[in-house]
Amino acid sequence: MIKWPWKVQESAHQTALPWQEALSIPLLTGLTEQEQSKLVTLAERFLQQKRLVPLQGFELDSLRSCRIALLFCLPVLELGLEWLDGFHEVLIYPAPFVVDDEWEDDIGLVHNQRIVQSGQSWQQGPIVLNWLDIQDSFDASGFNLIIHEVAHKLDTRNGDRASGVPFIPLREVAGWEHDLHAAMNNIQEEIELVGENAASIDAYAASDPAECFAVLSEYFFSAPELFAPRFPSLWQRFCQFYQQDPLQRLHHANDTDSFSATNVH
């Protein structure tokens, strides 16, 4: 019998968090009971260690907090919560937000412009998100803002800047870079053929290696059926790094649904 961590007797001053309800989103339906229990344990620790900061009047209740924590912890389910030690705060806007962006062009001129962002992440500093896109991260569509920003944090553990290569053994770096760049080229070829809007993988993945790793991490967890057959070698590298196989998880969930359907009387 699985001993659910949120069903343990709590002290009188502590309010039980709605973990069971928080788990009931499409992205997490394929998890086994053991995985759910482990994920909740990590998410509880996440909420103890990190500060969720609502901005611009956004209201953060216990269910929203739990679901945010679960999504943060899904990528590190097997890696461990220490992989998320590069930040202490999560800032949450109600909707995409405007920031001042500074960039340098090819001839060295510095430009400033205001742009709309869904999320932001720095090597040392808070993660910035918005609730509208967090809500869109609950399904299995290939889009997941939280996993995208977590991937950037995991990426920067390997050095001063995001490179698209997370902290893996040195002997595996060349193979990882080869497969990642091959995926970027393949995605770019599709974009040139059908256009960004019709591409089957988010075109942002072709912009640079760091974004490719972050975008494909979204697909790894929320649309493995699109990632695995298209980039099988890179898929295996992601499975080895994250120590998870979401495609196998998806097949198990589908088999369970089929079995249940055939046994309805």
Curated annotation (Swiss-Prot):
Zn(2+) binds at H111, H148, H152, E211. It is found in: Cytoplasm. One of its GO terms (molecular function) is zinc ion binding. Keywords: Aminopeptidase, Cytoplasm, Hydrolase, Metal-binding, Metalloprotease, Protease, Zinc. Disulfide bonds: none annotated. InterPro entries: MetalloPept_cat_dom_sf, MtfA_enterob, MtfA_fam, MtfA_N. Binds 1 zinc ion per subunit. Transmembrane segments: none annotated. GO terms for cellular component: cytosol. It comes from the Bacteria. It is an enzyme of class 3 (hydrolase). SUPFAM superfamilies: Metalloproteases ('zincins'), catalytic domain (SSF55486). The keyword Hydrolase applies. Its EC number is 3.4.11.-. Interacts with Mlc. Belongs to the MtfA family. Involved in the modulation of the activity of the glucose-phosphotransferase system (glucose-PTS). Interacts with the transcriptional repressor Mlc, preventing its interaction with DNA and leading to the modulation of expression of genes regulated by Mlc, including ptsG, which encodes the PTS system glucose-specific EIICB component. This is Mlc titration factor A.
